Amino acid sequence: MELKGTTILAVRDADGVAMAGDGQVTMGQSVVMKHTARKVRRLYRDRVLAGFAGATADAFTLFERFEAKLEEFGGNLTRAAVELAKDWRKDKYLRRLEAMLLVADAETILILTGTGDVIEPDDGIAAIGSGGPYALSAARALSRHTTLDAETVVREAMAVAGELCVFTNGHLTVETLRRNGGATT
């Protein structure tokens, strides 16, 4: 039986980026297997954030490959993402992986899809997973109509997603990167 269900959200503002992921792991459509999973991680000397949605084993495979690309390209997020996407499209094994990654540094947010696409959102806000549309909508509304910082926006938007998506809970992992090099967890 497949383990699935999550929400990952990233928001960029003038000071940097914040990324959050919920902690719920669901088996099938009805059984919560874990409440405190950590789906957002720091990569490449704590300068890159990455979150995953989809099959857990597949996501860890992608994390490993993405981290190797970051090392290969000196932490260049966009180059590492594009090179991983090329591999993803070419490799018969990778094409079968059922996962997506949301990756960010202090300047850029990218979505890496299971079809090998690399998408940079126009507005500095991106979400993946079952609760992604809810979190994305809430984050856009908060960003447009308030002066909240990125971390507060991701926390509030994830709370909305948790209220609406049965595969998303309120146990959050939140990571931030500041443009000046600072980071918080």
Swiss-Prot record:
| Top-rank EC class of the record's enzyme | hydrolase
For this UniProt record, the keywords arranged alphabetically read as follows: Allosteric enzyme, Cytoplasm, Hydrolase, Metal-binding, Protease, Sodium, Threonine protease
User: What does the UniProt record note about how this protein's activity is regulated?
Assistant: Allosterically activated by HslU binding.
Whether Metal-binding counts among this entry's keywords is: yes
Question: Could you say which EC number(s) this protein's record lists?
Answer: 3.4.25.2
Similarity field: Belongs to the peptidase T1B family. HslV subfamily.
- Task of the protein: Protease subunit of a proteasome-like degradation complex believed to be a general protein degrading machinery.
Question: NCBIfam families, per this entry?
Answer: ATP_dep_HslV (TIGR03692), PRK05456.1 (NF003964)
Q: Which PANTHER family match?
A: ATP-DEPENDENT PROTEASE SUBUNIT HSLV (PTHR32194:SF0), METALLOPROTEASE TLDD (PTHR32194)
Q: Could you identify this protein by its name?
A: ATP-dependent protease subunit HslV
Gene name in the database record: hslV
